[in-house]
Curated annotation (Swiss-Prot):
One CC-aspect GO term: cytosol
Protein name according to UniProt: Ribosome maturation factor RimP
Subcellular location field: Cytoplasm
Keyword Cytoplasm: yes
Originating gene: rimP
Length: 162
């Protein structure tokens, strides 16, 4: 079975841009292509490779220039397009171990595979699962298989203290 043109394009873009992101010390989180009037919009989402921290605007600008140059050199996208390079943002669902490692120290809400919800501070994340100090004060360990998804809660007070 031959992949659709869109699937093939996304695969070529990912193959092209993963090493570009890695060369900038970043992780290629996602690539999407969508119509934008007479053009196409190429959205590239980059993140730090692992662990807590924030991707600075200067680093993102440098990576954006590297992505743009790679796209121009490879001529993978035919016709005019608009390039958008961004980070996942705080509303990204936490679905992979790397996402949880990136959110260490943050307040999170988890939806467990059993359907229940747990909120608390994400203390750590390792290869086996995550360790959360719940709102009730207990430290609980969850295996990744037991967590359907998670999300970071924006907390202004915590940012002001840190």
């Amino acid at each position: 079975m031959t992949p659709s043109p869109d699937t093939a394009l996304l695969g070529r873009l990912r193959d092209l841009l993963e090493p570009v992101a890695a060369g900038c010390g970043l992780h290629l989180e996602d690539v999407a292509v969508s119509p934008a009037g007479r053009r196409r919009r190429v959205r590239v989402t980059l993140d730090l490779a692992d662990g807590p921290g924030a991707l600075g605007s200067n680093d993102l600008a440098d990576a954006s220039r590297a992505v743009s140059a790679a796209l121009d050199d490879a001529d993978v996208v035919t016709g005019p397009y608009v390039l958008e390079v961004s980070t996942p943002g705080t509303d990204r669902p936490l679905t992979q171990p790397r996402h949880f490692r990136r959110a260490q120290g943050r307040l999170v809400t988890l939806t467990l595979a059993a359907g229940t919800h747990v909120s608390g501070r994400l203390l750590s994340a390792d290869d086996d699962g995550i360790h959360v100090r719940t709102d009730a004060g207990a430290t609980t360990t969850f295996a990744y298989a037991d967590v359907a998804t998670g999300r970071v809660e924006v907390e202004l007070r915590h940012l002001e203290e840190g």
